[in-house]
Amino acid sequence: RDAVLRHNSAIFGGEVVRIVPRVNFTAPGGDAELLGVYFADSGQYFENRMLVDHSVPNCRSNVLYKGALQGEKKNEARTCWVGDVLIRSNAQGTDTYETNNNLILTDGARADAIPNLEIETGEITGAGHAATVGRFDDIELFYLMSRGIPEAEARRLIIRGFFNEVIHRIPVQSLSEELENRISEELEKISA
């Protein structure tokens, strides 16, 4: 009853990585937040597949994952994110949202985002999902460069900003700082 779960996931390497978190609410009043960041390079495949099962009343869940991908055409960087949220018939008062955003940095990258939401009752507070897969925004890049910021630094700033929504929600400062450092290391590969 009234349990709180904060799950943080970060993937920055590995040829094939699969992470499969599961949340199963068994008593009312639970609150779960699942946060994730990933940065895939050539030849890497990352899969995040989660299930949030709302089976009791008055629980809340929020899922937010963000990833960036850069790869070569011959050796793609690939990611797959599947977010399953189930709101069962006796889970009145549920409030849930899931989001996955992917930033494609090169032509040799592919991201699949599959949010699934199954609702068996109409008596909920809220439920929704969103997923995006998009290329780097040249308009933002142009704006920063018009302000005198060199192109490589402007790219790094935009990508850091993309991940900040997740990183700033992590309450453990040492963990959020480590993630910022790992992202900086990945960004150095881009400008190299």
Predicted segments with their positions:
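Conserved beta-strand/loop scaffold segments within soluble protein domains that form the structured core
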Residues: 1-149, 163, 170, 174-192
